[in-house]
Amino acid sequence: MKCPFCNASDTKVVDTRASEDDKIVRRRRECISCHKRFTTYERYDFNNLTVVKKDKNREAFDRDKVYRGMKKSCEKRPVPDSVLLEATKEIEVELTHSNKREVDSSEIGELIMKKLKKIDKVAYIRFASVYREFTDVKSFNEEISKLDNE
């Protein structure tokens, strides 16, 4: 681990703590050269999870892409970032617990819609309109009717 202050490659771990859910490890480090301290966070690596797109192309799972999709749907809505970050984490955990090496993008889209439906119905409709490729007002009305009937 390189020191962010002096770029020396020799550091030592001073303190290690796990998060409440044991998904992230926080480490306090000290540089041997300049003696400054800094914090690092280690998280489970999702690079072993591959997303299969509609066109059958494959790419590594990207949690930021999930977050950005939800964030875009919630623009100008009263939804705190902390809620979206928690939902992103829950989607990650659900995908991890499925023990699949590959997951269809449609499965991720459905998980996002499920979370957004609970968080904010307007954001849900926004996401659904893009994800399900609504082409007319009728599609919007049908989805809104489904929400009203729940």
Curated annotation (Swiss-Prot):
UniProt GO MF annotations: ATP binding; DNA binding; zinc ion binding
Zn finger region (unnamed): 3-34
Species name: Finegoldia magna (strain ATCC 29328 / DSM 20472 / WAL 2508)
Cofactor(s) the protein needs: Zn(2+)
GO BP annotations listed: negative regulation of DNA-templated transcription
Assigned keywords, A-Z: ATP-binding, DNA-binding, Metal-binding, Nucleotide-binding, Repressor, Transcription, Transcription regulation, Zinc, Zinc-finger
Pfam family name, one: Zn_ribbon_NrdR
Cofactor annotation comment: Binds 1 zinc ion.
Keyword Transcription regulation: yes
Protein name (database record): Transcriptional repressor NrdR
Family from the record: Belongs to the NrdR family.
Summary of the function given for this chain in its UniProt record: Negatively regulates transcription of bacterial ribonucleotide reductase nrd genes and operons by binding to NrdR-boxes.
Family matches, as InterPro entries: ATP-cone_dom, NrdR-like_N, RNR_NrdR-like
Gene name of the encoded protein: nrdR
Upper lineage: Bacteria, Bacillati, Bacillota, Tissierellia, Tissierellales
Domain ATP-cone: 49-139
HAMAP family tied to this protein: NrdR (MF_00440)
